[in-house]
């Protein structure tokens, strides 16, 4: 229930849907399995295992999930069958098979195999924080995060969400913190970072499980490299990697949050309810604090 990586989008709090409206809209775009010659199918599914509902509400938060099912048809299988058919035509009809005919045979083979192909599925979850006005997506890859945002917009007929563009870049802030050897406010340096240089061949330095205030680490910044990823700890509650794209990776929710969730959840539903609220609230407050050190939002 705890997101291990996060992309987020600021929302217009005044125009967020109620839980029942959101559920009705998502029902019109509910997931169905791949059929016939479809290569994939995508739609909304239940975000929690103990309920069939498409929205899991917890106080000021709403959890949703987008599921994608894709057919798996290895190119090698198609190639082997195609070679057999081409050889059969050449032997039986004593003629060569041209490029156009090979393409037609390949398409026919694909159509024959597709209904019987294996499938693989994936899902992307998101939580609406209606109190703070954020959509938190459980994926740091921009393509995955933007896809569920697009599907939500399509289902709702629009959703006012924007990219997290701040006046100062995350890379600039991270570079400054590493150079001065400490962070501001409730943030502390952890033990991992990534730095990049400039030039035709961009040098990349990855530091893992080291003291980030050590001279050999700081020297990379003094030599002109900028920080693109930085390990941070926030108020002894959350450890994470901040990226230059303002996404969060390798998130760890420390004992104080885990124990609070467990103390408020007596069963699967109760634990999910408490975890969702604590995660959304703590992450959102942390993001707002980060935004303040980044100079606020771009106008």
From Swiss-Prot:
Disulphide-bonded residues: none
Annotated compartments: Cytoplasm, Nucleoid
CC terms in the record's Gene Ontology section: cytoplasm; nucleoid
Pfam families given in the database record: RdgC
Any one biological process term the GO annotation gives: DNA recombination
Key words of the record: Cytoplasm, DNA recombination
Chief place where the protein resides: cytoplasm
Primary role: May be involved in recombination.
Recorded family membership: Belongs to the RdgC family.
PANTHER family: RECOMBINATION-ASSOCIATED PROTEIN RDGC
Protein name: Recombination-associated protein RdgC
Organism (species): Neisseria meningitidis serogroup A / serotype 4A (strain DSM 15465 / Z2491)
Gene symbol of the encoding locus: rdgC
């Amino acid at each position: 229930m705890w997101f291990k990586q996060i992309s987020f989008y600021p929302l217009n709090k005044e125009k967020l849907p109620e839980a029942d409206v959101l559920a009705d809209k998502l029902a019109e775009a509910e997931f169905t399995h791949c059929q016939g010659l479809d290569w994939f199918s995508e739609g909304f599914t239940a975000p929690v295992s103990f309920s069939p509902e498409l929205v899991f509400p917890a106080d000021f938060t709403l959890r949703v999930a987008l599921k994608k099912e894709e057919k798996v048809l290895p190119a090698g299988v198609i190639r082997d069958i195609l070679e057999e058919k081409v050889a059969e035509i050449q032997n039986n009809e004593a003629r060569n098979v041209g490029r156009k005919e090979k393409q037609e045979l390949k398409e026919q083979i694909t159509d024959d195999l597709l209904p019987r192909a294996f499938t693989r599925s994936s899902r992307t979850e998101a939580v609406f924080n209606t109190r703070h006005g954020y959509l938190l997506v459980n994926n740091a890859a921009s393509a995955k995060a933007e896809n569920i945002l697009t599907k939500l917009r399509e289902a709702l007929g629009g959703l006012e969400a924007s990219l997290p563009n701040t006046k100062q870049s995350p890379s600039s802030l991270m570079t400054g913190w590493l150079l001065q050897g400490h962070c501001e406010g409730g943030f502390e340096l952890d033990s991992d970072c990534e730095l990049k240089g400039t030039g035709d061949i961009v040098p990349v330095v990855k530091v893992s499980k080291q003291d980030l205030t050590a001279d050999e680490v700081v020297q990379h910044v003094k030599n002109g490299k900028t920080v693109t990823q930085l390990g941070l700890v926030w108020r002894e509650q959350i450890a994470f990697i901040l990226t230059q794209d303002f996404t969060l990776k390798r998130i760890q929710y420390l004992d104080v949050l885990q124990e609070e969730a467990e103390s408020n959840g007596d069963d699967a539903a109760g634990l999910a309810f408490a975890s969702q609220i604590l995660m959304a609230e703590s992450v959102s407050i942390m993001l707002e604090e980060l935004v303040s050190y980044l100079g606020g939002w771009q106008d």
